[in-house]
Amino acid sequence: MICKNSIRHKELTLIIFLCFIYLSKTFVEVKAPPYVLVPEGSDINLTCFIKDDQGAGEDKVIVAWQQGDGEVTQGIKTTWDTTRQVGQTMLHISKVSKEAEGSYMCVVWINGDADYKKMNLGVFTVSKKTYMHNEVSITPRRSRVDMSDGRPLKIECAFSTRRIYGRSQVNIKWWKIDGITRKWEQQTSGVNLLLHTYGGIGSLSIPNPTTGESTGKYMCVVTCGDIGNVGFRLVKSLSPLSDTESDHSYTSEEGSHFMERCKVKKSPYGGWIVE
């Protein structure tokens, strides 16, 4: 169900004021990532997740967005599940530019109770030299990933940090460049994040990859608190000659020379992985 955004600027100011006074009494809970880092020219959705326990219907959900000190009235879509008492509000920005950078805030008002969240939007230009010099490090920054049609594919970005971040502070988003429009498109299915003390691994799983649709240039964007970094993965299809049999079996003739090869790489958690 979709809720309408109907709130005036003075009402928005009042809601924010009441949030500071009654924050400890509120039933409404709003969550959002503190920092969102996106490639320039892409289409994005800034999202706030809503939770309530008052049994409110969709008509009781009032939402407002601010960019800096100004109210935003376009591109807002709010959904609400009356049964589960959860929902989300999204602010859609098309072809995001550097001018869109800055502070955003969503405010949610339900049956007299309110909550809000602020987030910062960062926009970067993608180039061969794209790299943020901060305490989030993605290794390797660039690498090639081989795939075979029909075989499950997992693309990974291992990252490390100089300090410990909570689960709510760490996010990973995956993007793939469109070969025709040259526009970065966000990948939302198959995204997973595994954390350890000082970093983790973000992955993108494609259960049934195909040459053309799944091959190409991917980008992982990892944010920790108010900083982030990017890594690039080039997915290429193995040729029939370099591909192996589906059952991973090999045959040889008696008396002939035979050599078998395996790939060994270091695990980010210590030790070694044999593929």
From Swiss-Prot:
Domain Ig-like V-type per the UniProt entry, residue ranges: 25-122, 140-239
Entries under InterPro entries matching the protein: Ig-like_dom (IPR007110), Ig-like_dom_sf (IPR036179), Ig-like_fold (IPR013783), Ig_sub (IPR003599), Immunoglobulin_dom (IPR013151)
Keywords, comma-separated and alphabetical? Immunoglobulin domain, Repeat
Coiled coil ranges? none
Instruction: Extract the SMART domains matched here.
Output: IG (SM00409)
Does the record's keyword annotation contain Repeat? Answer: yes
* GO cellular component terms listed in the entry, alphabetical order: B cell receptor complex
**Where does the source fall among the domains of life?**
Viruses
Please indicate if the UniProt record lists Repeat as a keyword: yes
An example of a Gene Ontology BP annotation on this entry? B cell receptor signaling pathway
What protein am I looking at?
Putative Ig-like V-type domain-containing protein FPV055
